[in-house]
């Protein structure tokens, strides 16, 4: 009988979006417990070794982290299996680089470089609002932050902008039709579009209809929607492709056009 937490993760069972080869080993890094779920995070080691190619082995990643070069959301992290997740800002002081973890249209975390100015804040989705001891209102975000005394106008599913230096809310975006959003779960993961309407289903999941910049419409659960800007202007920079998913035929035509122009 197994007692206690699981400490290993087989490569075959690792999330697909980490893009680890099946045959290069038996095990994958098991993310530590942290603000993001195992299936929805990217361990620091995978980001530094497999994405940025700054290290060849896990030992090298450890040496980089132990020199306190890597910051996530403005805090130094030395744990190589720390689970970084959606909207987290990863800063590497030594190279002066800043990255934000956002999904591409294939549902993988894109290596998305951002400016120093943009690295000072992040957006968080409001998961729940509760009243704590002595009637103090609390707000809980998607990355497990608890913020006391929020603006009473902020409701669940809204998005708050957090200053990473102070951890305080600087602004917020209402969940409303006409606002631009990103899909953070389900089959449409990584797509960006404008909320067109919300179907309410009491006792079940509300369904949200979204229209992307090419005019394609799709629907998903409200829990998969993350509002990223007012109107159709996002508050963060988007990775290449701007969250517009192409059909297989469109991708092929784009590839052929690129080939002809370079050839």
From Swiss-Prot:
Q: Which keywords has UniProt assigned to this entry?
A: Ribonucleoprotein, Ribosomal protein, RNA-binding, rRNA-binding
Query: What does the record list as GO biological process?
Result: translation
Name the source's superkingdom: Eukaryota
Entry keyword annotation includes Ribosomal protein: yes
Q: Name one GO cellular component term.
A: cytosolic small ribosomal subunit
A single Gene Ontology MF term assigned here is: RNA binding
The record ties this protein, via Pfam families, to: 40S_S4_C, KOW, Ribosomal_S4e, RS4NT
InterPro entries per UniProt: KOW (IPR005824), Rib_uL2_dom2 (IPR014722), Ribosomal_eS4 (IPR000876), Ribosomal_eS4_C (IPR032277), Ribosomal_eS4_central_region (IPR013845), Ribosomal_eS4_central_sf (IPR038237), Ribosomal_eS4_KOW (IPR041982), Ribosomal_eS4_N (IPR013843)
Keyword Ribonucleoprotein recorded: yes
Residue stretches making up the S4 RNA-binding domain? 42-104
Q: PROSITE patterns given for it?
A: RIBOSOMAL_S4E (PS00528), S4 (PS50889)
PANTHER family membership: 30S/40S RIBOSOMAL PROTEIN S4, SMALL RIBOSOMAL SUBUNIT PROTEIN ES4, Y ISOFORM 2
Q: Which family does it belong to?
A: Belongs to the eukaryotic ribosomal protein eS4 family.
Q: What is this protein called?
A: Small ribosomal subunit protein eS4, Y isoform 2
Q: Which gene encodes it?
A: RPS4Y2
């Amino acid at each position: 009988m197994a007692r206690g937490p699981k400490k290993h993760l087989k490569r075959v069972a690792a999330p697909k979006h980490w893009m680890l080869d099946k045959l290069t080993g038996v095990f994958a890094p098991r993310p530590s417990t942290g603000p993001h779920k195992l299936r929805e995070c990217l361990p620091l080691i995978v980001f530094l070794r497999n994405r940025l190619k700054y290290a060849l082995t896990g030992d090298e990643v450890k040496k980089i982290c132990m020199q306190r070069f890597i910051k996530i959301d403005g805090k130094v992290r030395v744990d190589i299996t720390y689970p970084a997740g959606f909207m987290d800002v990863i800063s590497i002081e030594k190279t002066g680089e800043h990255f934000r973890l956002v999904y591409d249209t294939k549902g993988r975390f894109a290596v998305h470089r951002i400016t120093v100015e943009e690295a000072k804040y992040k957006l968080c989705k409001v998961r729940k609002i509760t009243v704590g001891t002595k009637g103090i209102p609390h707000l809980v975000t998607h990355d497990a932050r608890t913020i006391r005394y929020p603006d009473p106008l902020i409701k669940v599913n809204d998005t708050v902008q957090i200053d990473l230096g102070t951890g305080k809310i600087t602004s917020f975006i209402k969940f409303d039709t006409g606002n631009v959003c990103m899909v953070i779960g389900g089959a449409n993961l990584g797509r960006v579009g404008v909320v067109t309407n919300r179907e309410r289903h009491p006792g079940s999941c509300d369904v949200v209809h979204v229209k992307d910049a090419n005019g394609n419409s799709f629907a998903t659960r409200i829990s998969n929607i993350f509002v990223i800007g007012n109107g159709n202007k996002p508050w963060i920079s988007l990775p290449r492709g701007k969250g517009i998913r192409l059909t297989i035929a469109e991708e092929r035509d784009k590839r052929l056009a690129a080939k002809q122009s370079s050839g």
